[in-house]
Swiss-Prot record:
Organism: Actinia equina
Localization (cell): Secreted; Nematocyst
Protein name: U-actitoxin-Aeq5b
Stated family: Belongs to the Acrorhagin I family.
Other comments on record: This toxin interacts with divalent metal ions (zinc and nickel). This suggests it may function as a metal ion chelator to regulate metal ion levels or as a metal ion transporter, or that its function is modulated by metal ions. Both Thr-23-Pro-24 and Cys-71-Pro-72 are in the trans conformation.
């Protein structure tokens, strides 16, 4: 079950990345907010702290909280 969630999250990240690169950048606040949250998520995933599954799970949780509470 956890692997399935991870696969869907990774696919979502890939789709979001492709969509972000294909669409012209806009000044819509929620798009910028989601982009900022995603940038933080990618930074977390690439960091040394994400060397085991629990640490990487925290990156996912932090991203979800960022989007749900910080973006309009």
């Amino acid at each position: 079950m956890n692997q399935v969630m991870t696969i869907f999250l990774v696919l979502g990240v890939i789709v979001y990345s492709v969509e972000s690169s294909l669409t012209p950048s806009s000044d819509i606040p929620w798009e910028k907010c989601r982009h900022d949250c995603f940038a933080k998520y990618m930074s977390c995933q690439m960091s040394d702290s994400c060397h085991n599954k629990p640490s990487c799970r925290q990156c996912q949780v932090t991203y979800a909280i960022c989007v749900s509470t910080g973006c309009p």
